[in-house]
Amino acid sequence: MNLNELRDNAGSRYRKKRLGRGIGSGKGKTSGKGVKGQKAREGVSLNGFEGGQLPLYRRLPKRGFKNIFRKEYAPVNLGALDKAIADGKIDAGTVVTEDVLRTAGLVGSGKFAGVRLLAKGELARAVTIEVSGASATAVAAVEKAGGSVRTKAARDEAQAPA
């Protein structure tokens, strides 16, 4: 078989039905739209319109609200941090801050209030990490590897005047 002998399977491609081309075509006159009425007209699609019946979105009660003061934290997993150190994107000897994580590409470009360290994956080396927040299991895993974690809450408490 040569490239010039390739053919589509029979029935895999078919022409679309041309509408409004006489009764004999099978799709003539009303072109499959039935008779009269709003749905037979042009440009009918009104999303959520139920013909004067109270629409579903108005029948159901309102729920919840959007908190405009919500703080969103970028998640960074220990496995990703360990891989970045192994790849040479982060120097294990320095303090790993949020800026270091951002330059290494572990934190996205979105507007985040800070970075939260999570415990997914393994950390094989001792690292000092300074982030906005960390899960208890992540802190335990870092300390088990011989490193330490400082969170923003702990820093603020330490700097607060007595």
Swiss-Prot record:
One of its GO terms (biological process) is translation. One of its GO terms (cellular component) is cytosolic large ribosomal subunit. One of its GO terms (molecular function) is rRNA binding. InterPro entries: Ribosomal_uL15, Ribosomal_uL15/eL18, Ribosomal_uL15/eL18_sf, Ribosomal_uL15_bac-type, Ribosomal_uL15_CS. Residues 21-35 have a biased composition (Gly residues). The keyword rRNA-binding applies. Pfam families: Ribosomal_L27A. Residues 1-10 have a biased composition (Basic and acidic residues). Residues 1-39 are annotated as: Disordered. Keywords: Ribonucleoprotein, Ribosomal protein, RNA-binding, rRNA-binding. The keyword Magnesium does not apply. Part of the 50S ribosomal subunit. Binds to the 23S rRNA. Belongs to the universal ribosomal protein uL15 family. This is Large ribosomal subunit protein uL15. It comes from Gluconacetobacter diazotrophicus (strain ATCC 49037 / DSM 5601 / CCUG 37298 / CIP 103539 / LMG 7603 / PAl5).
